[in-house]
Design a protein with these regions (language model features):
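Long, amphipathic, Lys/Arg-enriched alpha-helical "connector/arm" segment
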Residues: 148-178
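Basic/aromatic DNA-contact patch characteristic of tyrosine site-specific recombinases
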Residues: 1-73
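N-terminal core-binding DNA-recognition domain of tyrosine recombinases/integrases
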Residues: 44-59, 68-151
Length: 178
């Protein structure tokens, strides 16, 4: 990527409109705009489908929108659109959001939430026939049994970062610390 600012195209204005002219829950389904126009009609369909797939809280809908908009702005700066993203773009985005010394660096938990939002977007895009393959790679992981359920093998998005759980954090007495 070189020096910051090199290799980036001029960025268009991509924003979130948190309310739309509709009744009920649809009023809280965000719109993604480029300037004064809808960014992409298929992306809008994704947001309209979120309540049907269990995302009903207006706070969750808003979080999805802002996660997606930051990604769209990044892609726009790279000269790409939402449905043209590749695994290399995800890697570059990770460097920008997690590893650079930039002011906009985010926590692992925030990164994982953004990955979950984008993963859902691209899985939806695959189901709708908009893309052949999502820009994320997956690997099989063992999910241990919980609450009487059997353990199973599941596909895990490689872009997720491991976040320390409270059970992983232990007190170490000073005598044991070296």
């Amino acid at each position: 990527w070189g020096v910051r600012g090199e290799g980036f195209a001029p960025v268009s204005i991509i924003t979130v409109c948190e309310r739309r002219e509709a009744k009920g829950l649809d009023a809280h389904v965000p719109l993604i705009l480029r300037g004064d126009a809808l960014y992409d009609p298929d992306l809008d369909r994704f947001f309209l489908d979120l309540p049907l797939s269990g995302v009903r809280s207006r706070h969750s809908l808003r979080a999805y929108a802002y996660d997606v908009v930051v990604w769209l702005r990044f892609l726009d700066a790279c000269g790409k659109t939402v449905w043209a993203a590749t695994r290399d773009d995800v890697d570059a985005y990770h460097r920008e959001r997690r590893r650079d010394d930039a002011d906009h660096r985010i926590t692992a938990a925030s990164w994982n939430r953004a990955v979950a939002s984008l993963d859902r977007l691209y899985r939806w895009g695959e189901q709708q026939g908009l893309i052949a393959d999502a820009p994320f790679s997956r690997r099989a992981v063992w999910r241990p049994a919980q609450g009487g359920r059997r353990g199973m093998i599941a596909a895990r998005n490689d872009a997720y970062e491991r976040v320390a759980r409270r059970s992983d954090v232990r007190f170490v007495p000073m005598d044991d610390y070296r």
